[in-house]
Structure formats: structure tokens, C-alpha cells
């Protein structure tokens, strides 16, 4: 890990801790932007579940729209917006390639989830058309009956994705739109640079 990458990661960690201890309702909420095989972009909010020097991890159904996007076009952008921080909020952008996390990591995280969340992962055919709420409720009841009295295993089609950073951008809001921006970016040889940007 290069010094500048370590600096960017440490900066994120400090800001994330600040957001977790602030008035933010959900500091781990991040916008995930992907593109499908035709290059059509899509964005949605997901929750950050872990981060370290290897990257930023979230979990999903692998056959969801985002899962299909990431398996056919394994690049993504993340956006954290913490409005309650500092003078006028802080925004962090992270861009990078995407990898599936190991089965062991996915198993460990799935086992830590509330039981009803585990059941929901089995019952939901994420991103597919649903005829009615009653249909979903019936699927939930069926899964509950199937696993009654025993642990709920991780579905084969459910797992984690890791965004491996190739760029970080930190935006510090200020009055009169006189913001401060810093960008860390890796080149093709994985050499990191740091520069200040006009707001």
C-alpha cells in the first residue's frame, strides 16, 4: 500500500467515524453507480458493510440488476454524502474496479444478519417483477417453514462485492460555494497522485 493510498484511506476512515458519531441517520449509506453491458448507467443506495486496504464491501443478490451490471462491467463509483459534517457537509467519491468477495467472507457476514433478513434473502427474487405483496409474503412464509428450527444458510446467489479504489475525491463544503476538493488517483501502473481541484 503506497503512502498516498494509505493517506486517502485514513482520511476516509476519520471522516466515516465522524459521520457515525454525528447526526447522520445512516453514515454507511452510499450511492452505488454501475453501468450495464450497453453502457446504460444506474444508481441506487446501498450500505457499506466493511472497508480496509483491499477495498469497500457491500452485499447483494448476484442476479440483481446491480449484480448483473457488476459481473458484466466490473467498474463502479461510490458516493457518500454527509450533510451534517463540518461547515456545509462533506462528500466522498470512490471509483474503482469490482471483485466478488470470498465465499467465506460472504458466509460470515450472512451469518451475522438478523434471521428475518436471512429469510428475506431467500424469499426475494431481487429486481424481478412481483405480482403482489401477498406473493412476497407467501414466499417469506414458505422460507420460514423450510428453515424452522435450524440455521438459515447463505443462498448460493447472494454475496459480497468489493470496490477496489482507483480514485478518491474528498469535497469539503463551505459557505458561498467556496468549497475545497482533493483528488487521489492511481495511474495505469498503480502509482498514486494527489492534487487539489477548483471547486
UniProtKB/Swiss-Prot annotation:
Disulfide bonds: none annotated. It catalyses: pyridoxamine 5'-phosphate + O2 + H2O = pyridoxal 5'-phosphate + H2O2 + NH4(+); pyridoxine 5'-phosphate + O2 = pyridoxal 5'-phosphate + H2O2. Keywords: Flavoprotein, FMN, Oxidoreductase, Pyridoxine biosynthesis. InterPro entries: Pyridox_Oxase, Pyridox_Oxase_CS, Pyridox_Oxase_N, Pyridoxamine_oxidase_dimer_C, Split_barrel_FMN-bd. Pathway: Cofactor metabolism; pyridoxal 5'-phosphate salvage; pyridoxal 5'-phosphate from pyridoxamine 5'-phosphate: step 1/1; Cofactor metabolism; pyridoxal 5'-phosphate salvage; pyridoxal 5'-phosphate from pyridoxine 5'-phosphate: step 1/1. Pfam families: PNP_phzG_C, PNPOx_N. FMN binds at residues 44-49, 59-60, 66, 91, 126-127, 171, 181. Substrate binds at residues 49, 109, 113, 117, 177-179. GO terms for biological process: pyridoxine biosynthetic process. It is an enzyme of class 1 (oxidoreductase). GO terms for molecular function: FMN binding; pyridoxamine phosphate oxidase activity. Its EC number is 1.4.3.5. The keyword Disulfide bond does not apply. Binds 1 FMN per subunit. It comes from the Bacteria. The keyword Flavoprotein applies. Its cofactor is FMN. Belongs to the pyridoxamine 5'-phosphate oxidase family. Catalyzes the oxidation of either pyridoxine 5'-phosphate (PNP) or pyridoxamine 5'-phosphate (PMP) into pyridoxal 5'-phosphate (PLP). Homodimer. This is Pyridoxine/pyridoxamine 5'-phosphate oxidase. It comes from Xanthomonas oryzae pv. oryzae (strain KACC10331 / KXO85). The gene is pdxH.
Amino acid at each position: 500500500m503506497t503512502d498516498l493510498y494509505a493517506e486517502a484511506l485514513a482520511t476516509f476512515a476519520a471522516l466515516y467515524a465522524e459521520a457515525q458519531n454525528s447526526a447522520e441517520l445512516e453514515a454507511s449509506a452510499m450511492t452505488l453507480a454501475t453501468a450495464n453491458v450497453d453502457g446504460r448507467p444506474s444508481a441506487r443506495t446501498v450500505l457499506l458493510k466493511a472497508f480496509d486496504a483491499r477495498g469497500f464491501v457491500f452485499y447483494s443478490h448476484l442476479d440483481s440488476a446491480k449484480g448483473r451490471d457488476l459481473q458484466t462491467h466490473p467498474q463502479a463509483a461510490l458516493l457518500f454524502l454527509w450533510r451534517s459534517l463540518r461547515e456545509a457537509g462533506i462528500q466522498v467519491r470512490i471509483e474503482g474496479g469490482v471483485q466478488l468477495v470470498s465465499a467465506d467472507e460472504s458466509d460470515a457476514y450472512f451469518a451475522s444478519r438478523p434471521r428475518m433478513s436471512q429469510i428475506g434473502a431467500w424469499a426475494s427474487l431481487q429486481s424481478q417483477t412481483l405480482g403482489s405483496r401477498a406473493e412476497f409474503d407467501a414466499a417469506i412464509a414458505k422460507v420460514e417453514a423450510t428453515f424452522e428450527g435450524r440455521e438459515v444458510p447463505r443462498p448460493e446467489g447472494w454475496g459480497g462485492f468489493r470496490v477496489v479504489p482507483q480514485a478518491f475525491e474528498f469535497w469539503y463544503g463551505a459557505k458561498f460555494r467556496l468549497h475545497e476538493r482533493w483528488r487521489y488517483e492511481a495511474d495505469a501502473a498503480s502509482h498514486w497522485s494527489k492534487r487539489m481541484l477548483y471547486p
